[in-house]
Curated annotation (Swiss-Prot):
HAMAP family: UPF0102. Belongs to the UPF0102 family. This is UPF0102 protein HEAR0176. Pfam families: UPF0102 (PF02021). InterPro entries: Restrct_endonuc-II-like, tRNA_endonuc-like_dom_sf, UPF0102_YraN-like. It comes from Herminiimonas arsenicoxydans. GO terms for molecular function: nucleic acid binding.
Length: 124
């Protein structure tokens, strides 16, 4: 059940920037021929920004956006702990399927205006 609009907390600047990054990533991946299955899948184990389909492969996408490359940039912010949470969330997502499809974990790293698509960035 969703809360009425007047009860929702205002979104932070960080959440707004994150949403914009996800929007950019989604448009880019759709132009590359991937189809959106689900956005912002949340479960007890974690969250997956985008679940896409690339042919017969299910793709779990983590989107990271940074204003600059300080502190290693967007890709470096996908820590081992974050990777574990993504894998747990993906396992929960895959419980929907009797015969889970092939899958992979990609990262879309956006540093300022530069976007990098890192396929198979996380191994489960």
């Amino acid at each position: 059940m969703r809360l009425p609009t007047f009860l929702k907390r205002p979104r932070t600047a960080r959440q707004i920037v994150g949403q914009m990054g996800e929007d950019e990533a989604l448009r880019y991946l759709q132009k590359q021929g991937l189809a959106l299955i689900e956005r912002n899948f949340r479960c007890k184990g974690g969250e997956i920004d985008l679940v896409m389909q690339d042919g017969d492969t299910l793709v779990f996408v983590e989107v990271r956006k940074r204003a600059d490359k300080n502190h290693g940039g967007a890709a470096a912010s996908v820590t081992p702990e974050k990777q574990k949470r993504l894998i747990v969330a993906a396992h929960i997502f895959l419980q929907r399927y009797k015969m889970p499809p092939a899958c992979r974990f990609d990262v879309i790293a956006i540093d300022a205006t530069e976007m990098n698509w890192l396929k198979n960035a996380i191994e489960s």
